[in-house]
């Protein structure tokens, strides 16, 4: 008996070698023609073995709501069935597009340091955006006041100290209208 050897296209061979790192038999099938139906794709996949799970994805919202996303996931019963599906389907024409079949892998969340850094204002007071120099001084003054209180508490540890005063916002005075409200300005815009 001679063992039958098949030569694989280089691309398919590299895809199959990635499968040794995979746990399970889940494939990603992409570049799907929008006209291909879930039923026809499932029938095509069942030719390669028993399909345990099949996820055909659709757009959930937006202008394309209800239309296929262009890819799906399939779980086969055995690894051999999944490998056979990769060999036969990768690069094959389905309607007007060539299918792309790969081993599915978990999406890795990458932390982007630049994207997630939040720039916080120097002070969270409402006046900080209009008067940055005043807010810098008020922060410095607050730090000095806290340091002085800590020093005083260190010198007299048995004394009772009043609770910190309620934080007061330095709200700029309300601007007064220089002209009366008029509806004529609104009518001219229409």
Curated annotation (Swiss-Prot):
GO molecular function annotation: RNA binding
Keywords tagged on the record: RNA-binding
InterPro entries referenced in this protein's UniProt entry, alphabetically: Nucleotide-bd_a/b_plait_sf (IPR012677), RBD_domain_sf (IPR035979), RBM18_RRM (IPR039157), RRM_dom (IPR000504)
PROSITE patterns: RRM
Record's keyword annotation contains RNA-binding: yes
Cystine bridges: none
Segments for region (Disordered): 166-190
Keyword Ligase found: no
GO (cellular component) term, any one: nucleoplasm
Name of protein: Probable RNA-binding protein 18
Gene3D superfamilies, per the entry: 3.30.70.330
Domain RRM: residue ranges: 25-106
SUPFAM superfamilies tied to this protein: RNA-binding domain, RBD
């Amino acid at each position: 008996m001679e063992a039958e050897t098949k030569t694989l296209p280089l691309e398919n061979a590299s895809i199959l070698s990635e499968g040794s790192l995979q746990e399970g038999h889940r494939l990603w099938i992409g570049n799907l023609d929008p006209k291909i139906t879930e039923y026809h794709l499932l029938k095509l996949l069942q030719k390669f073995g028993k399909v345990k799970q099949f996820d055909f994805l659709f757009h959930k919202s937006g202008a394309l709501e209800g239309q296929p996303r262009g890819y799906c996931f399939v779980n086969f019963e055995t690894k051999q069935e999944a490998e056979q599906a990769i060999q036969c389907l990768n690069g094959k024409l389905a309607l007007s597009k060539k299918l792309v079949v790969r081993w599915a892998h978990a999406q890795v969340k990458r932390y982007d340091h630049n994207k997630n850094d939040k720039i916080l204002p120097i002070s969270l007071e409402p006046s900080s955006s209009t008067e940055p120099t005043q807010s810098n001084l008020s922060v410095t003054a607050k730090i000095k006041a806290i340091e002085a209180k800590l020093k005083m508490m260190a010198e007299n540890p048995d004394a009772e100290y009043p609770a910190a005063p309620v934080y007061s916002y330095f709200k700029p005075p309300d601007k007064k209208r220089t002209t009366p409200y008029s509806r004529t300005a609104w009518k001219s815009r229409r």
